[in-house]
């Protein structure tokens, strides 16, 4: 089992102590980072340290090569193709991507993730405009659960890749009752859906700080999971034994 421990850089004494006590016979990597993340909520936090840890615990449809600055397919089979008017883009998920419980990732997870990212009831006002200014809708292919398309509101140079930046979340975990199935993207974007008590309760739960701090609530498609978080001291990531990648 491989572990990564991220120590928050508060004092040299603390770091020295931790390193000396570390058992070098185990597959453990210790990394020193300057501060703890503001949280590890899939959508509501937005610090650099969060993004760093998410590079191990979460996955997006597309990845960005930091040397060439070119996008590459991560959860999808190839880069999206586009319609003639460059407003609709077509994706196909890899068939080997699975959640930790063994469930296959499908277009339903992508549609759900996009709806939550765009919804004004999600506490992500710092990044939501990046997405709801471009994305008009995400639609499932009726003949293939791994295929879906995204339509942009207008021709935009970020339209082809914008959906690829959302951390994909498991619909069956977050929305087992299909609460969002009958809420359209149009209703979400113009805020015309009915805010029922059930929906308000769902967002109160989803936005709760526990979903950014408690290890058991931090779900993702990455090769590691958060096994321990000691506030202001360290975060421990443990390698998944049966990761799909």
Regions found by a protein language model. Name each.
Residues 66, 168-245:
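Gly/Pro-rich hinge or "lid" segments in bacterial periplasmic/extracellular proteins
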Residues 78-124, 149:
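Aromatic- and charge-enriched surface segment that lines or borders ligand/interaction sites
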Residues 32-84, 115, 219:
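N-terminal lobe/hinge region of extracytoplasmic solute-binding protein
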